[in-house]
Amino acid sequence: MRDPQNIAEVSALGIDLMGFIFWPKSPRYVSQISSRAGIIPDRVNDDMLDGRKADVKYVGVFVDDMPQNIVTRVYNFKLDYVQLHGNESAVMIDNLKATLIPDIAPDIKIIKALSIREADDVKRWREYEGHADMLLFDTKCKCVGGSGEQFDWSVLEGYDGNIPFLLSGGIGPDDVERVKAFKHPMCVGIDLNSKFETEPAVKDVEKLRAFIDKIR
């Protein structure tokens, strides 16, 4: 998400979270406005924040980024969640929280994405117990998210952790019944991305509206 009008329209659909990709290699990358001066930090395009609704939480997605870059974007974009989609360790999460809490973002939450292909991949959740506030189970692939591919959700039956999670990985408009049939006590939501886009970073509002209406 980066187009102000699209952000406002999607925010009005009653969603809970909205993601912003801060990985430079992604076609969905959200850039900042350069200050053109090394001693002055870059800033956000204020238009992106104008359509924000109070009940929509902002999620910044990062991939093995430097902590100072994450902190800057948390502050500039007023992020509620940081989603780590690379090989970030539990120690890195703890250090990031220590930097952000309490002065910069006292209520910040950390989501750790785990790439899933088989049951053993799910077991990695134990590395983040007591560190991540939420997990996101995505499809393991050569790319970093946004593949449009799904994994076998039945492997999540083996997840016996106490960290709530989001279900991700190629969920599309035709998956309404499959999503409604999926049950797990720790699943708190689903992640909708590439299957609801007209182009990278631009969501098809009507497709989203129809899907959300059917799910709820």
Residue positions per predicted region:
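Conserved N-terminal beta1-alpha1 strand-loop-helix module at the mouth
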Residues: 1-216
